[in-house]
Amino acid sequence: KAKVVKAQVDIAAIETSLKMYKLDNGFYPTTEQGLLALIEKPTTDPVPRSWNEHGYFEKQRVPKDPWGTEYVYLCPGVHGTFDLISYGADSESGGEGINADITNWEVQE
């Protein structure tokens, strides 16, 4: 349960970082640029013109989910402007319980 909560907190923090990126640059990073765009200035289009030289994460690294897997970032998203996903303990799409996906569009109970 604690790992699920940690993933939810991480996703909320990543969302905040993405929103700060958009406030500075007028757009979100593309799927191809990925979350790495929050710590390293992208060199592919669209190149951000007002990228924060300190990046958008306090620790200057993209967090992994509590199971050691990278968060999935899609922009444009299927469920919103962007989608953030942890595939849970099994690192596979779908599942139930601790294997359930944790996302930025569904509230976990």
What does each of the following model-derived ranges do?
Residues 1-9:
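Amphipathic alpha-helical segments typified by the pilin-like N-terminal helix
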